[in-house]
Amino acid sequence: MNLKMKKLLNGETIISREPGNSMTPILKSRQPVQLEPATWEQVEKGEIVYCKVKGNYYTHKVYGKNKKRGCLIGNNHGHMNGWTKNVYGKVIKILPPK
C-alpha cells in the first residue's frame, strides 16, 4: 500500500511533493502541497486530488464526475488519465516551492 494513500485513509493531513511538469503552471515539479483526506464523492470538478488511476498515483485535476465511473482525472495540459473512484485526498494548500 502506498504510504501517502495509507496516511490519507487513516485521516491524516499530509505534505506531498510530486515530481514532473504535468501540472505546470499551477504546480512546479516537487512543489509541496498540503493534502487532506477526501473521497471521490467529496471532491468537485476543478479541484486537485491525490488518486490512483490504472495502477498509477497522481496529483491531478478533476475534470468531471459520474456516479457510475467516479472522477475523470487529468493533468493541467489536457491529457486525461481516466476515470477512477480511487481518490484519497485533495489539495487544500499549495506551498511555496523550495
Task: Report each predicted region and the residues it spans.
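Extended hydrophobic leader/signal-anchor segments used for secretion and membrane insertion
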Residues: 1-98
